[in-house]
Amino acid sequence: MVLFTLEDFAVFKATTLATRMHLIREQLDPKFAEAATVIVPLLQTDQQQAIYSHIAKHQRRYRNPPPNTWVAFSTSSRGYKMVPHLALGFWDDRLFLWLSVLRESKPASRVLTGITAMATTLPGKWQVAGEHTDKAMLPLTSANLATVGARFQTIKKAEFLLGKVYLADDPIWADPVRLWQDIQQRVVALKPMFDQLVQNV
């Protein structure tokens, strides 16, 4: 069973590139790989549409250590940035699960068609954001969803993220089993929107 714990945040206390990368490879990547064995089947209910996992490699890092790390799930075996995808990962103070459409997917101008109506029916608390390299986020409301969606459509570098953020001070971290169960439930809840985004592209 995959268990993400508060101890995982210690990876980001390493201040050098080599040390942090070593800790990411030793501590987080194995958990991401194990998580993928569960999440891929949750997303791949249609056997005609394969889902691939992509663990961040940080190959372009030469001096500064990565501020975050993740595993992404997409319908492309070659990568994930160019297509809608699901990302599960860490910053130094939070775990995130984002359904993401990055700027690289921009040629598909109608990629968000149908998403607003689906998002407003999600149970529980969710967040939206407009930039995957920034921690900034907003609670999921109709108004915030409209704002992020409009920005995505009108600003070239804007992105669209919808999902769940687990801050390090969230009480759920006291029960790693419950956290993992919640992540899986949210993957299932996001799957219809994931499928719609893939279809739109």
Curated annotation (Swiss-Prot):
Alphabetical list of SUPFAM superfamilies matching this protein: YktB/PF0168-like
Cited Gene3D superfamilies: Protein of unknown function DUF1054 (3.30.930.20)
Pfam family of the protein (one): DUF1054
Source superkingdom: Bacteria
Family that this chain belongs to: Belongs to the UPF0637 family.
Protein name: UPF0637 protein LSEI_1198
Organism whose genome encodes this protein: Lacticaseibacillus paracasei (strain ATCC 334 / BCRC 17002 / CCUG 31169 / CIP 107868 / KCTC 3260 / NRRL B-441) (Lactobacillus paracasei)
The organism's taxonomic lineage, starting at the top: Bacteria, Bacillati, Bacillota, Bacilli, Lactobacillales
